[in-house]
Amino acid sequence: MLTRQQKEAIVKEMTEIFKRSSLALFADFTGFTVADLTELRSRLREKYNGGARFKVVKNTLLTLSLKDAGYEGYEEFLKGPTAVLYVTDGDPVEAVKIIYNFYKEKNADLSKLKGGFLEGRKFSSEEVEKIAKLPSKEELYAMLVGRVKAPISGLVFVLSGILRNLVLVLNAVKEKKSE
């Protein structure tokens, strides 16, 4: 049993985390072994180096923390055993992909991913799959660079073709005059 001071410290810590987080995803963790949850945490640690965590916290403490952090509409996520995946540093979509794929690999009920908040916007359990299928920030940057680069490459190709044709015409004129 936690003392009042310990509970207050947890609420304060989680409030600060929720204020800084780009993602707070709530999940029912029942049915997983300790080894399973350790594996999930190691995947997050490997990708985020501490910028994302999967933490089990009592619902009453989460309620106080979310309220203090200014969130609204979280009550539906805090029914039954609940853990929270939060991201304070890095791409939040990648974290959703990691937990979504983890639940899929373990044949867990995907509705156990209850929903949460992404960049301050609330999302439901049904939207978790859609978020997991979004491209990561790196992929979006690569797509953007490709789209910007394509017209420039086309322009360079056209201009080089014009120069090539000019050289061919000049060579033809030179040969004609030398005859």
Curated annotation (Swiss-Prot):
Query: Is Ribonucleoprotein among the key words of this record?
Result: yes
Q: Which HAMAP family match?
A: Ribosomal_uL10
Hey, which family's this protein in? Belongs to the universal ribosomal protein uL10 family.
Q: Which GO terms describe its molecular function?
A: large ribosomal subunit rRNA binding; structural constituent of ribosome
UniProt lineage: Bacteria, Thermotogati, Thermotogota, Thermotogae, Thermotogales
Q: Does the keyword rRNA-binding apply?
A: yes
Could you identify this protein by its name? Large ribosomal subunit protein uL10
The record's keywords, sorted A to Z, are:
Ribonucleoprotein, Ribosomal protein, RNA-binding, rRNA-binding
Q: Which GO terms describe its biological process?
A: translation
Cellular component GO terms held in the UniProt record: large ribosomal subunit
Name the job this protein performs.
Forms part of the ribosomal stalk, playing a central role in the interaction of the ribosome with GTP-bound translation factors.
Q: How does it assemble?
A: Part of the ribosomal stalk of the 50S ribosomal subunit. The N-terminus interacts with L11 and the large rRNA to form the base of the stalk. The C-terminus forms an elongated spine to which L12 dimers bind in a sequential fashion forming a multimeric L10(L12)X complex.
